[in-house]
């Protein structure tokens, strides 16, 4: 996934770097159009060729069989979850805030981030919203976040069981808010580096993802483990639901070409066994819920 540009957005109210949003009486500046279009977005600066290579965040080699002839695509991704689970840290890593002095990054705020990536040979721009608050007075914002996303990252901390239980509640709320839509959702167990403080096992996270029909991944924002894979995955999940069958088949063929032979054999054998064994089918689904390249 190659970084092309980064933009961060916010309303006109000046704020300190570490402040979170509070909702003013007139919150119209928070409203986001449902279908962003390139013409409506602020002009962005492209990186110099050498910077483009140096700051590559790529998931592909140069032998991609898929072109980006249809142009750039925009996806609005919303971070939700309990306070203190690492949502803002994930957002900052995504936006390149930690190395912003070395990047061509225009800082307009702290709660909305925009970044253009190349995943499987095709450009996609993620507009990442990190405006979820847990205070009661922000109920309007909760409802707004539940409605505007093209995809959702429900984040919990593996060191905090209460945040895991809250993540399950948020998945139910999201299902109710978007009943007729097949919205991509990834359950994100953050802080995986804190092994000795773990309260939620990997198997529990996977089981929850299977029950609530979403994907699952564990990350560590502190050491940036699986963060790249997370944002690659959410792009792929949206594409799988939106794009034509033929286009997705080409992407799948590209991914399978890079897959090892032993892994192909295990996947094929697993499908055969699962046909006649419901328990095995559940186990395989649990194992596949972390594969962000398939539905």
Curated annotation (Swiss-Prot):
Cellular localisation: Cell membrane
GO MF annotations, alphabetized: GDP binding; GTP binding; GTPase activity; magnesium ion binding
Record function comment: Could be a regulatory protein, possibly participating in receptor-mediated signal transduction at the plasma membrane. Has guanine nucleotide-binding activity but undetectable intrinsic GTPase activity.
Membrane topology category: Peripheral membrane protein
PTM notes: Phosphorylated on tyrosine residues.
Similarity comment: Belongs to the small GTPase superfamily. RGK family.
Keyword Nucleotide-binding carried by entry: yes
Binding residue positions for GTP: 81-88, 190-193
Any one Gene Ontology cellular component term annotated for this protein: midbody
UniProt-recorded name of the protein: GTP-binding protein GEM
């Amino acid at each position: 996934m190659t970084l092309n540009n980064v933009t961060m957005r916010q309303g006109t109210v000046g704020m300190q770097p570490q402040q979170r949003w509070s909702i003013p009486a007139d919150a119209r500046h928070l409203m986001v159009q449902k279908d962003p279009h390139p013409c409506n977005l602020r002009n962005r600066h492209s990186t110099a060729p050498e910077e483009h290579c140096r700051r590559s965040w790529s998931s592909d080699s140069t032998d991609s069989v898929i072109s980006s002839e249809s142009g750039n695509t925009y996806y609005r991704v919303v971070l939700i979850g309990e306070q203190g689970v690492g949502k803002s840290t994930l957002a900052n890593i995504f936006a390149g805030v930690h190395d912003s002095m070395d990047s061509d990054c225009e800082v307009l705020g702290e709660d909305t981030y925009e970044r253009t990536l190349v995943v499987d040979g095709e450009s996609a721009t993620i507009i990442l919203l990190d405006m979820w608050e847990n205070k009661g007075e922000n109920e309007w914002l909760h409802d707004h976040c539940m409605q505007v996303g093209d995809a959702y990252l429900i984040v919990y901390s593996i060191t905090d069981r209460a945040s895991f239980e809250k993540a399950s509640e948020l998945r139910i709320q999201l299902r109710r808010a978007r009943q007729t839509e097949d919205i991509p959702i990834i359950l994100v167990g953050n802080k995986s580096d804190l092994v000795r403080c773990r309260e939620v096992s990997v198997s529990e996270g996977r089981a929850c993802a299977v029950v609530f029909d979403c994907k699952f991944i564990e990350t560590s924002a502190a050491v940036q483990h699986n963060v790249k894979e997370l944002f690659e995955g959410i792009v792929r999940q949206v594409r799988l639901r939106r794009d034509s069958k033929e286009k997705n088949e080409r992407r799948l063929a590209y991914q399978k070409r890079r897959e090892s032979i032993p892994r192909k054999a295990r996947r094929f054998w697993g499908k055969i066994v699962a046909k006649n064994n419901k328990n095995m089918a559940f186990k395989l689904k649990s194992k596949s819920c972390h594969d962000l390249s398939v539905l």
